[in-house]
């Protein structure tokens, strides 16, 4: 039986991992590191990924209660508090939000790089928004039936919104739908505010369209060309159709 191969580091001997020879060593197990490892391994390289933490994910990690306390407090709380909080494994706290649009570019990149071979995704059961008009939380509709019953829209707005979405689906997007990326389409010469006005959408309809569907962070987009907003709304629709409950998936 051959002796175990070791490597010397700072005066100590450590057993070699695999055969001890790698083309690339990547430090960290965050999203970008995993994507890089996947791309390099697809090229036939031997890749070793190391992480100084006791958990995977880097800045994108999901931590149990013990890991969370050690990261932000340095140590666990006293025993009586631990008992009150329950089992550490019952907690899974994301360090950053991880919702992905199911048909978005990041989802495509994860698939191409092979990261999806090591991750499982599940569809979020629903998306909810707070309506300033009705002062209540409501589910974003994903079916015709839900759209007709949602409190987010008045009856007249539901009819106008149906026409709006029908119109959106027929609009040409540069670089998509068989349209050249540099082609000058009508959307480039129209602001989003003008687009909303064309279909008669009120402020409430504009709010949840721009922020809950197109995911704009503020209202600056209203006076910008409507192309990017229409593209985002279409992506939202494609992503909902992919799974039927919500446009978002979660690893």
Predicted regions and their residues:
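Conserved N-terminal glycine-rich FAD pyrophosphate-binding loop of Rossmann-like flavoproteins
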Residues: 52-96
